[in-house]
Regions:
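Intrinsic disorder/low-complexity detector
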Residues: 1-26, 50-116, 145-183
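Long, low-complexity interaction regions most often at the N-terminus
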Residues: 15, 30, 36-40, 55
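A structural feature that tracks compact, well-ordered secondary-structure segments
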Residues: 27, 115-116, 125-131
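Amphipathic alpha-helical segments that form the core helices of the histone-fold
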Residues: 40-51, 128-140
Length: 183
């Protein structure tokens, strides 16, 4: 796998995990159920598509500034993904930077979605984001047993909320992203 492919996979994985953490956080903190979580997800996907179009039109930095402008008082301090483990090598620091940038964008889009789909104001959005960080830290602890283990426990949380089986696809997994392998 090339470095560019690794970076892209890393960003995608971070985005997927933080979006799942956001949904779990909405359920944990406010009891938001399956139907309304579906509305939030649909609204977030629309925001993410808009962000992607803006990124292509004006570049990443301007698109991020526009997203921050839309968020305004909903999320004035943005979102900084906590490190699940201390980076040691330059590659680890770069990976953390990519994860943080992806998570910042995804959380921003989900925050806008919660505002639009659930009429959440700044207090509720910020409460959800704080709970999202807590859920992500919990996920980070789970990945100490390996990425698959962390994903499986996060999937269990989503199964509890959606009352439907969720499987973790590891068929294309070549190297860990959030934790260590068991071998």
């Amino acid at each position: 796998m090339t470095q560019a492919e690794r970076v892209q996979k890393n960003r995608e994985a971070a985005g997927h995990v933080i979006s799942m953490c956001f949904l779990v956080a909405l359920n944990n903190r406010y009891g938001i159920g399956e139907e309304r979580l579906g509305r939030v997800t649909d609204a977030a996907n629309a925001e993410l598509e808009r962000f992607d179009l803006e990124k292509r039109a004006v570049g990443m930095e301007k698109a991020k500034k526009r997203l921050a402008g839309k968020l305004g008082e909903l999320l004035p301090n943005g979102f900084l993904l906590p490190a699940t483990k201390t980076p040691r090598r330059e590659k680890d620091w770069a990976m953390l930077g990519e994860q943080r940038e992806a998570a910042e964008i995804v959380v921003g889009c989900y925050a806008l979605a919660a505002h639009k789909a659930l009429s959440f104001g700044p207090d509720r959005v910020q409460g959800t984001v704080a709970e999202t960080e807590r859920v992500f830290r919990e996920f980070g602890a789970w990945t100490e047993g390996g990425d698959y283990f962390g994903y499986a426990l996060l999937a269990r949380e989503l199964e509890r909320i959606f009352r439907t089986p969720i499987t973790v696809d590891e068929s294309d997994a070549r190297e860990p992203i959030f934790g260590d392998t068991l071998d």
